[in-house]
């Protein structure tokens, strides 16, 4: 009998804390989208596009980028050699982004150096939700060129 009383009292206390509004359901984060990768011989080109709101303030500051849901960052790296022993290659990156309505933006790409690493970064503005197609032309030092195209979806955070 005493066991039932303690159980009933415990349930009553637990339920007393349930009187407020139910918490809002969590908004699921959009799934992480993989980087786009292109291999040409022993050269690997990797491109990543993400909303700058996902960057930490420190990273955004280091990249010289304003954080925001509607600002998308394109990060491109050109590497040569076997994985884990790759060296950065200088290149000229030309990039455009096109949304589903056919609106096209040129992305101004700039060099981003960190130690021995060399990447290229640029931003574009978008409306949300949106699907963006990225078209890149990569011209490596020495004149070899290649293209890359990939699509990513972006949602309000």
What residue ranges belong to the model's regions?
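Bacterial N-terminal signal peptides that target proteins for export
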Residues: 1-7
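C-terminal motif of bacterial Sec signal peptides marking the signal peptidase cleavage site
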Residues: 13-17
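Beta-strand-rich structural segments
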Residues: 71-82
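Short acidic/polar inter-strand loop motif in beta-rich domains
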Residues: 140-147
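Bacterial signal peptide processing site
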Residues: 18-22
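Post-signal-peptide N-terminal segment of Sec-exported extracytoplasmic proteins
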Residues: 33-68
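Short, solvent-exposed, Trp/other aromatic-anchored flexible loops in extracytoplasmic proteins
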Residues: 110-135
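Short flexible loop/turn segments that cap and initiate beta-strands
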Residues: 83-95, 104
